[in-house]
């Protein structure tokens, strides 16, 4: 059976298009793989500091269980329905991330539907655009992206959140983020940051080795 020239040319064009798409896909895979490895290195560098801080707080509370600090202030006198809650929402800057952004956005929306007085502190352009379109209460002085995170930026973010908590603009602070369980499994998480819960700093969690530094 003969094939006319038009059909042959169309097939060749389709084949070239598929090959070009494969090249682009492979390039995107290599870039994302490189970024993933870099992110994992940064995480492994940061985790020891995080867990050692937890262990240090645990040791302090073990020896001084009655310690009072504003970060532990539960503010019992404020009714649950009247509590002002700050929600730090971590999303991506781009939409090509599957369910990554969708799951966090839906979890945040569900939480806000159950709590009346919520203020959003959104990290990432996708989340900011999403919640802006829905006319939700977003902190305007919080224009942070998630590309190339640095300690300086993290310090600026934490200073703003801590200030709002200590000034009683917020009674509670929560963070909504994605926990990476493996390269293919990720789980959205809703975690309370402030006030700190003493029960979470139990002595048996202080399993990290430590060194005392004595300064003059």
Give the label of every model feature segment.
Residues 2-213:
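C-terminal beta-strand-loop-alpha-helix "lid" module of Rossmann-like NAD(P)-dependent dehydrogenases
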